[in-house]
């Protein structure tokens, strides 16, 4: 992994959509993918017909920390990732997975943790985490021209609800939908997932 940056991730989207021949399309961003999607939509306004953002933020955890305690909490997870990512201890995997999907079944939590561990090294995961926590696309939000739907669960343990509200407030004309739930990653058995899909369907049909 040579470059880990917002610009590199935007170029990744460019590469994929060019390869499949998409000229204009709806773009869905989740978690840190929301900031990346915002950056893409601003760089290529003619290509994004609709922007859909779930569980995201404009400012990463390091940038939006209101005090030293909040900053240290965010950095504590970075330390855990760097030191415990490849560890066989179930304690780290349980902590990490339960943050993202507290309503997950035992099987879902274990599969998620194992997938994370196998798909990248501890050092790459750390660099990825540090980069996303330093993202700030606040200045890009007013430049988004695509119709935008922003959704966020109220009890998200990874990205605070207020971060989602801030994201929506900065985008002209964005619709913000507050959802009852706690899973940062939508789960099949979670009732809120059906609501998310319905909101997207209605939004795209307008």
Question: What are the roles of these predicted feature ranges?
Answer:
Residues 144, 150-152:
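Short beta-strand/loop motif that positions the catalytic acidic residue
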Residues 174-206:
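Catalytic active-site module of serine/aspartate enzymes centered on a nucleophile-bearing elbow/loop
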Residues 1-28:
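Active-site loop/oxyanion-hole signature of alpha/beta-hydrolase fold enzymes
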Residues 86-131, 140:
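Conserved alpha/beta-hydrolase catalytic His-Asp/Glu region
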């Amino acid at each position: 992994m040579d470059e880990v940056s917002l610009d590199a991730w935007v170029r990744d989207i460019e590469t994929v959509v060019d390869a499949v021949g998409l000229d204009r399309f709806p773009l869905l961003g989740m978690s840190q993918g929301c900031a990346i999607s915002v950056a893409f939509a601003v760089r290529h306004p003619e290509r994004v017909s609709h922007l859909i953002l779930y569980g995201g933020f404009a400012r990463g955890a390091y940038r939006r920390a209101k005090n030293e305690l909040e900053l240290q909490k965010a950095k504590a997870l970075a330390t855990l990732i760097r030191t415990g990512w490849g560890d066989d201890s179930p304690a780290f995997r349980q902590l990490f997975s339960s943050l993202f999907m507290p309503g997950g079944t035992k099987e879902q939590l274990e599969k998620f943790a194992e997938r994370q561990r196998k798909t990248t090294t501890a050092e790459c995961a750390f660099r990825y985490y540090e980069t996303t926590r330093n993202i700030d696309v606040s200045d890009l939000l007013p430049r988004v021209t695509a119709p935008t739907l922003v959704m966020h669960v109220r009890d998200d343990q990874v990205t605070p609800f207020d971060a989602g509200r801030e994201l929506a407030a900065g985008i002209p004309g964005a619709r913000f939908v507050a959802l009852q739930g706690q899973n940062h990653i939508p789960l099949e058995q979670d009732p809120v997932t059906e609501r998310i899909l319905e909101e997207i369907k209605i939004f795209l049909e307008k």
